[in-house]
Amino acid sequence: MRRHAAFTLVELLVVIAIISVLVAMLLPAVQAAREAARRSSCQNNLKQFGLALLNHEAALGYVPPGARMKFGAAGPQIGANANVALLPYLEQAALNASWDHYRSYWEQESIVLATPVPLFTCPSNDAQTISDQAFEDVGVPAGLRLATSDYAFSRGATDAWCLSNEYPSHENGLFHIVGEGFADVTTLQQISDGTSCTFAIGEAAGGEAWTVCTLPGCTAPEGRSRADVPWMVGNLSTAEIAAAGYPFTGIYGTTIEPLNKRPVTSTLVDNAGITDCRSSVDGGTDATSNFRSDHADGGFFLHCDGAVRFIGESIEPAIYRGLSTIAGDEAAP
């Protein structure tokens, strides 16, 4: 009787072991390839931001302000941030048409506020594209859902909320608040440090992995918040929110704190001193969050010439801060 050839148990185990070794060898390469693709997509997002900024400046003669502020009977009102002004230049015509530019961001339709923009999301970040953090304890309507962004506008080497005519600062970045009593809009011609040596936008990862702590230099996470950044908010008036246990981050980043600092420093606007534009090192009471990314060892930054470069965590603090200012007169790195 003829016997059919077959695998023995030992041979089968050897084959399984070989396959397991091959999978173990290939898996890191596959994961690395996927992360490389995510990094490339994140970098391309910032390049699109760069084109939008340059086109806005070419069309209107200035860079969109970080936000606009006006004072009324109800006190200071902080408008939407620069993302809203950039929508027409980011191929977001439909979303721009849905936005009521005569109303503040909190008066917009809820469906508009909850609309995520793919360009605002870095694929390496696993945060939600819509923040479900609840601020109703401090008067923000319950159930308000805000779509998020993984990118922040550069405030410079300062954590001050604003740039007052009374407190001009060589530490200022490209984006600041515009309104009566505050500095005027910024043009590319004002960047005396050179557009290729100046940050415009950097990464601002969010999600559960990025907890938040209060005040500059903090090291212990506090409250119930994570570093989610609503893409449209100029800034919430946040002293009450922080007091209620909701330290959170905003649409601006500063180099006064280290890149990828964890926990993330909260963004804080002190209502009582909202026109006091001093940084924390000058005795001010405000705070601005640090830049951070889910890429290993650094993060991507859009420069004012439209180029996107990866900045490592090991960068010298003085060089890092100098790259974020528009007229600090620092030596080029």
Label the predicted regions.
Residues 36-333:
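Surface-exposed loop/linker segments characteristic of extracytoplasmic
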Residues 4-38, 48:
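N-terminal single-pass transmembrane signal-anchor helix
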